[in-house]
Structure formats: structure tokens, C-alpha cells
């Protein structure tokens, strides 16, 4: 696993490029009469940084060259017991995904929608890792999805205990919640496989 300082540098070097995209997006919503609350906008900025953090931790954007050289493991549950720390880290990595989605969006209050989104995001990570950015492992897909599910249940329990805090002012007023999430995820992937490696290797000269 990368050092914390390295993770911060790599994730921030990609994140700065989505900030203007987010600003323009929320400005567009405001102009079209769909202004979002300050709390929601702030939480979305945090959520997007978290997405960059996931891709950084999983090794995406680590090299500046792209070559298709897949290393695939399709044997489920193999190595989970022998590598418990890695398994736990993969689980914890996706817990915020399951928490953020229902926290930010009304259309993600159903566990099926949340888990499916976490599964698709994790699957996208595994596919991109085939291009010289890590190993594609079905166990990661299973554990990441389980982490998303756990995050949802944490949100669900807290929302029952503190309903006003978890619903008032943070929920999106946009009818296109699901489209918005996939837009943010798409932009994150594009930046991390194109611009971010160039910044890291050419501008910052980090190996």
C-alpha cells in the first residue's frame, strides 16, 4: 500500500481537475432553477475526493504508460483468509461509498440501488486495472461490494437514530440523482487515467 503522503499527493493532483467541473455543474443547476443546498454541495465535493482516493489506493494512475497486460484471478474467496489485513482494508475502502450515496441522494435510499452502484464502480476499477495498473481479482469485487452494503446499513441505522441530521439540508433536490453519481464517477476515472499521471510524472516528477 502507498504511504499516506503519497496517496494524498496523487489523489489531490487528480482532484483539482474535477473542482472546476463541479463548480460549473452546480452553477448550471442554479441557473436552471435546481439550486442545491450548501451542505449538499460541500458533501459532494468530499464524496468526489473520496472517489479519487479509491482509485489512488487501488493503483490507478500510478504509471504514465497504458498497456493491456491483465493479471486476473477468478477464484472466489481464495486468499481471503491468508491475507486478512488486505481483505479488511478492501472492505473498509468501500464503506464510505455505501454511506455517502443514501446520505446525499434520495434515490439511493434502497439498498439494491446502493449495492448495484458499488458493484459497478468496483467492477470498473477491476477492468481498468487490466491496463498495467494492478491485478484484477474477483475477491476484491466481492469484498468491495460487501463494504458498500455495510456502509449502507451504517447510514440506515444512524438515520433512524438521528433522522433530522441525516435528511435535512444534505439530500439532493435534483431529479437526476443516479445520472449525477455516474457523471462524477466517469469524470473521476477519465482524469485518473489521463491528466493525473501526466501531472505526477511530468510536472511533479514523482515516480
Locate each region found by the language model:
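Membrane-interface catalytic loops of GT-C/OST-like multi-pass glycosylation enzymes that act
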Residues: 134-137
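Bulky hydrophobic segments
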Residues: 1-127, 131-132, 153-207
